[in-house]
Amino acid sequence: PLCLVGSEMCIRDSNNTMLQLLQGAAVSMRSTRLGTDWTVNKPTSLLTSPLFHVSGLSAGVVTALFAGTTTYIYEGRFDPQNILRVIDKYKITSWGGAVPTALKRVLDEAPNHNLDYESMLVVGGGGAPMPETLIARTKQIFKNVEHNFGYGYGLTESGAITVVNWGDDLNNFPRSPGKPMPTIEVKLIDDDGNEIFDDEVEGEICVRSPSVMLGYYKNQIESKKSLNKDRFLSTGDYGYRKDDLYFISSRRTDLILRGAENVYPQEIEILLDQYDGVAESAVIGVPHDDLGEEVKAIVVLENNKITFDELELYLKDNLAYFKVPSLWEKKLKSLPRNASGKVMKHVLIDQSKNNFVEDE
């Protein structure tokens, strides 16, 4: 997963791994020293992200080397009980790269054990939206975290975290992944490539910094598509800005075109994931003869007493009518995820195209 090219390094991009036979993303090695460090002055950190993922390698290992901290690298299949034992045994003080689904599993397991979690001072998450209920539970279980909880947004091509939110901003705007990190420029562009300066206007997120990749290894065509002449990276993510904070709407490839309306799945997923009794959710677009696409919600429930009608009413109270899913599916098992912890929506879409339904 890692190779050196002169003074640079290559990291395999998980999305391109599936689609393009392991194309590498070359990232400038010098930029890693500029990364904000979750573990400075914290003696022992926990790393659960895979080392072939940018958060594991760059934000985890390399950052720890520069900071001179002790890092416990978790091995093997993710097991919430083992994670809790590691925190207790090694008196872990910081945990960075906590994917929401993994963090939730750990928090669900914590009350079942008589272990000491008071050493934990800092928790940093990412990889997916962080529900407000999960933020509150993290501070409840890890009592000494308080204001030292945060999460951010980034991607392999950007070299790790691009924007980050914690402290007062997180308390006031928990749905935002935050403000740009030092040395990082973020802008929004419309479909014609023009920069958007107004607040609360949707556009594609573009990033420029020393940590942005040099290009896709030995693939100039794709590199030119992703990097413009000013070295701004087109992320493929849609979002908007408000009071200097950025909000992520959806991946460009996830956007659902329902009739003449744009539907951003992440907006719906955040609401569903916050509903008591919903373990996780995914929203996808499925073909529709009249509308082009229809909105479908796939949910994993903790409580089988919850009905789709109940969830639909809840969403109608919080969303525009055209964003409320008209199709629902319940799964008994966890949603399919890649090694980075992200839901593999292409699998769910393929199952829907084949009229596959796991649970009635």
Where are the predicted features?
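Gly/Ser/Thr-rich phosphate-binding loop
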Residues: 69, 89-98, 107-172, 185, ...
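Active-site glycine-centered loops adjacent to acidic/histidine catalytic or metal-binding residues
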Residues: 127, 154, 178, 237, ...
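Conserved ATP/PPi-binding loop(s) of AMP-dependent carboxylate-activating enzymes
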Residues: 168, 179-183, 194-226, 263
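Conserved AMP-binding/adenylation subdomain of ANL enzymes
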Residues: 21-44, 52-94, 109
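Acidic/polar alpha-helix N-cap and adjacent early helical turns
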Residues: 350-360
